Amino acid sequence: MTAILERRDSENLWGRFCNWITTTENRLYIGWFGVLMIPTLLTATSVFIIAFIAAPPVDIDGIREPVSGSLLYGNNIISGAIIPTSAVIGLHFYPIWEAASVDEWLYNGGPYELIVLHFLLGVACYMGREWELSFRLGMRPWIVVAYSAPVAAATAVFLIYPIGQGSFSDGMPLGISGTFNFMIVFQAEHNILMHPFHMLGVAGVFGGSLFSAMHGSLVTSSLIRETTENESANEGYRFGQEEETYNIVAAHGYFGRLIFQYASFNNSRSLHFFLAAWPVVGIWFTALGISTMAFNLNGFNFNQSVVDSQGRVINTWADIINRANLGMEVMHERNAHNFPLDLAAVDAPSISG
């Protein structure tokens, strides 16, 4: 009888735990994806903060020339970063127990791999948690679809690109100036500005900003006034009210006359779908572009493509970009190789006896 009661109590405990995890009545929804999301994101955040403050220099290029990235080693908020894992490690899984000592693990940039892998797992679980909560509330799944765009972009620069290039040392550093360095080197090696998918991403981001500003300003300009002139117009809205808060007909008429009739949406639902889809599709294409360039399927190269009748080159802006790319590549990893790969016309001499 005692054994039966104990089993029933344990079943009730597990049932209560399951209900607590999956209930939508909590202040913050946890969900089964949240069970994995919380520890992974906490780990990534904690290690990032500690490493950004106190991590020793990392031998990123594997040539015994460590690069400093933490605040205690001379950096500030702008120049500081988590330095990517050393080229010596390549794509190997490099947890702390794989190193001979913690000092060796830090010298080879172990924290970067730890942070990136936990972060990617965490944001993927956050995406799953969005789907889980939408499902339990009976909502449509478009929130998780929209969030998949930044998740795809982060996965591209932190995981797909290092895999394609053969080393986590080619991943994006976790810092402000490190991000800019990554962008410059990426342009030098892959000519990303001339890649159609990057162009679509630029159109998505800037177009999304434009459409968001246009929509917000139109709505704000066509609010249905519910207050006096001495009160804020925002006081005329009550959360959950059934009435429209702005006049979509007036906004439609204004915008249609400002540009032309069919440039303005007359359906609020299709309008908001468009506002969500435009930047999401653009960022999807950017992530896809990064993933293809990871395997060196690079942007267009129109180098010296325009010549006159005598065969002389007429420089175009594409040639200016190519020249800038060579200059940036020369500055990159200046001690790891003497010349950019584009200028290395002959094979290196053999050094074997």
From Swiss-Prot:
A GO biological-process term: response to herbicide
CDD domains: Photosystem-II_D1 (cd09289)
Residues where chlorophyll a ChlzD1 binds: 118
Gene3D superfamilies: Photosystem II protein D1-like (1.20.85.10)
Propeptide segments, given as residue ranges: 345-353
Site positions per UniProt: Tyrosine radical intermediate: 161
Chain positions recorded as [CaMn4O5] cluster binding sites: 170, 189, 332-333, 342, 344
Binding sites annotated in the UniProt record for pheophytin a: 126
Details of cofactor binding: The D1/D2 heterodimer binds P680, chlorophylls that are the primary electron donor of PSII, and subsequent electron acceptors. It shares a non-heme iron and each subunit binds pheophytin, quinone, additional chlorophylls, carotenoids and lipids. D1 provides most of the ligands for the Mn4-Ca-O5 cluster of the oxygen-evolving complex (OEC). There is also a Cl(-1) ion associated with D1 and D2, which is required for oxygen evolution. The PSII complex binds additional chlorophylls, carotenoids and specific lipids.
Gene Ontology terms: cellular component: chloroplast thylakoid membrane; photosystem II
Residues that hold chlorophyll a PD1 according to the record: 198
Gene Ontology MF annotations: chlorophyll binding; electron transporter, transferring electrons within the cyclic electron transport pathway of photosynthesis activity; iron ion binding; oxidoreductase activity, acting on diphenols and related substances as donors, oxygen as acceptor; oxygen evolving activity
NCBIfam families documented for this protein: psbA
Database matches in PANTHER family: PHOTOSYSTEM II D2 PROTEIN (PTHR33149:SF12), PHOTOSYSTEM II PROTEIN D1 (PTHR33149)
Name used for this protein in its record: Photosystem II protein D1
Organism expressing this protein natively: Vicia faba (Broad bean)
Encoding gene, per UniProt annotation: psbA
